């Protein structure tokens, strides 16, 4: 844990604050054009494709189709599972010169920004061609193996990468959950979310950003 945090080049203050949080394992299964990101089952053996460590626990899932640039997010909101479809968000990245080794791969640093003001630090490898990564982050010339959002005191990093041949059944969009696709369904979801969280003064588009936010 300490070694991986130092690899990401985080400040001592950020690393100290991260130690207060609980970490857990996530799996990222992927092929040449698709991926699915989900919390690792507690009874899984240590032979999964890719692990990411991140604070908190979750049973949510994120499926991404990079050919069609679409994704399906299964997210538990107010005690119910919802299926949320949208396009893969575009992030403008600035590629830096810094190099780090993560899980045996040479990774280059990149800096991006989400929600206008939140900076993201990523480390990607061009040895894995899929332009994906944990939490749906994508758009770099290879797989993201390290990710940090200093403002949120949150970090993800790959601890193991392995190749398998028979796992296509794992890379499927989630199907169990309440659908929220039409304008009417989304409006109803926003109203429920507003009542549940008390965000009466927040604009609907900002609430949707929260709903479609992190998979965690």
Language-model segments: residues:
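Extended soluble regions of mature proteins
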Residues: 1-216
């Amino acid at each position: 844990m300490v070694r991986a945090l130092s690899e990401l080049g985080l400040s001592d203050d950020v690393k100290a604050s991260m130690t207060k949080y609980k970490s857990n394992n996530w799996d990222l299964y992927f092929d040449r054009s698709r991926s699915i990101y989900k919390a690792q089952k507690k009874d899984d053996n240590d032979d999964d494709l890719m692990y990411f460590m991140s604070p908190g626990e979750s049973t949510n899932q994120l499926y991404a189709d990079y050919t069609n640039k679409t994704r399906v997010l299964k997210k538990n909101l107010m005690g119910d599972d919802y299926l949320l479809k949208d396009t893969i968000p575009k992030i403008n990245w600035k590629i830096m010169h810094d190099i780090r080794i993560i899980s045996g791969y040479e990774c280059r640093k990149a800096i991006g920004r989400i929600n206008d003001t939140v900076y993201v630090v990523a480390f990607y490898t061009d040895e894995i061609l899929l332009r994906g990564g944990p939490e749906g982050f994508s758009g770099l010339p290879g797989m993201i193996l390290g990710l940090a959002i200093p403002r949120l005191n949150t970090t993800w990093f790959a601890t193991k990468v392995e190749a398998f041949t028979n796992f296509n059944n794992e890379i499927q969009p989630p199907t169990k959950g309440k659908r929220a696709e039409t304008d009417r369904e989304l409006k109803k979801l926003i109203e429920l979310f507003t009542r549940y969280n008390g965000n009466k003064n927040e604009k609907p588009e900002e609430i949707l950003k929260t709903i479609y936010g992190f998979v965690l």
